[in-house]
């Protein structure tokens, strides 16, 4: 079975998630899995493609249920949890991931946003805290512009919001990225637009003053603060171009066509990590890695083949 065929099966299996009014129950998923396994033993290509598509459909539904589990289960009661801070404004807004709940590890860790209270001591990304939480699911109310906050929160892997009742630090050390950003912020301090520079370059929007955020939103330039796939792809292109230009000064035996490709992907992955590895950046890194592997395989791939594999 060709890799592009598998890619088409993945796309067809995941697509119904966009139009389903509600997720099927466990019994339905069990029946579909059994039915797909039976179809897989029929020696007809088309039937096996249908079986593979059904299996990917079940996998997509299970992944969706896993994302919604936190909002359906953890709300209401007070939860004893261990939270890793992934971003903070240093004051009352903190982004984190619940790594342990009631003493048991959770994987994948659901994300949450804590509002309205200062932590007992200075906070930075990378710290691990023991907290008593009161959380709720993000509401899906639409505003005048048609923006679905719940869909956006789920896409960002942050389905929960709430506050903490008690908090004590377990691991006070900051992550390497947080230490670098603190150093960069100190370097940019003399500049009037230091918060905007940090937001445009590193995607750190929490430190941008509210007045500037309002101006950027009203002028339609707020999206520039988000590190998108375009930024990551441009970083890969720039790095690959510099490496290719530097090969002019190397001996002929040291010049390989793979070097700019691998170097560009590595630089893109590093920049994505430096900007927080947000879902859009992560998806771009994965797509670049798939494209790189296709190129390194030595086969001739059409644009459609590459597009299908990256999309899947």
Predicted regions and their residues:
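N-terminal leader/targeting segments
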Residues: 1-74, 161-163, 283, 300
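Hydrophobic alpha-helical transmembrane segments in multi-pass membrane proteins
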Residues: 5, 47-50, 162, 214-312
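Generic recognition of cysteine residues
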Residues: 9-12, 37, 124, 174, ...
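Short, electropositive, low-hydrophobicity segments enriched in small/polar residues
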Residues: 17, 203, 207, 233, ...
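Helix N-cap and loop-to-helix transition residues
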Residues: 21-25, 190, 209, 256, ...
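Alpha-helix capping and helix-coil boundary motifs
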Residues: 42-46, 148, 175, 190, ...
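Membrane-interface helix/helix-cap signal primarily in integral membrane proteins
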Residues: 54-223
